[in-house]
C-alpha cells in the first residue's frame, strides 16, 4: 500500500524550530522525518506564509530570515497547495458547520483538496474530524 499524504499545519512547523521543549520537539521531528522519508508531507501556501511570518517574530529567539526562507524553499517539495475559489468555498462551509476560525478552516480545506485524511496540528483538537480530515496532535500520536 502506498502511504497516504499527511497535511502539516503551521503550529507543527513552528514547534519543530522552537528549542524551548526539547523532548516534545523530538516527537514533532520524528513525524517530520517520517513524512520526508515517505514523501507524504503536504502543506499549503498559507501554512508556509504563516510559518515565515511567525518563525521570524514569534519563537524565541526568532529565526533569521535567511534560515526561514531556506526552510520554506525546502518545504516546496511538499507540493504547497495554493487555495483557489473552490478551496475558499470549502473553508467557508467548514467554518459555518464546525465553528472553526477561517484560517483553520482554510487549512482543513487545503488538506481535503490534497486528498489528506490526516492533519498534524498542535492548534486543533486531537482526534477531531472535519469531514474526511482527522486531526492528529504529534505530541499525542506517534508516526
Where are these regions (language model features)?
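Generic alpha-helical structural context detector
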Residues: 15, 53-56, 73
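Short, well-structured N-terminal submotif of metal-dependent ribonuclease cores
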Residues: 1-43, 58-66, 142
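Beta-rich strand-turn-strand
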Residues: 99-101
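Short beta-strand segments at enzyme active-site cores
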Residues: 42-45, 120-121
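Acidic, PIN/NYN-like endoribonuclease modules and their adjacent C-terminal/linker elements
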Residues: 1-3, 108-143
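Acidic catalytic patch
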Residues: 20, 45-49, 69-97
Amino acid at each position: 500500500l502506498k502511504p497516504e499524504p499527511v497535511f502539516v499545519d503551521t503550529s507543527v512547523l513552528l514547534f519543530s524550530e522552537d528549542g524551548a521543549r526539547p523532548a516534545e520537539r523530538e516527537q514533532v521531528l520524528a513525524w517530520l522525518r517520517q513524512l520526508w522519508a515517505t514523501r507524504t508531507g503536504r502543506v499549503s501556501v498559507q501554512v508556509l506564509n504563516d510559518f515565515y511570518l511567525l518563525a521570524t517574530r514569534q519563537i524565541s529567539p526568532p529565526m533569521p530570515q535567511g534560515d526561514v526562507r531556506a526552510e520554506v524553499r525546502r518545504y516546496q517539495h511538499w507540493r504547497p497547495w495554493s487555495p483557489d475559489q473552490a478551496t475558499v468555498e470549502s473553508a467557508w462551509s467548514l467554518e459555518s458547520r464546525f465553528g472553526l476560525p477561517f484560517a483553520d478552516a482554510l487549512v482543513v480545506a487545503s488538506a481535503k483538496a490534497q486528498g489528506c485524511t490526516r492533519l498534524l496540528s498542535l492548534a486543533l483538537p486531537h482526534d477531531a474530524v472535519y469531514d474526511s480530515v482527522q486531526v492528529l496532535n504529534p505530541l499525542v500520536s506517534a508516526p
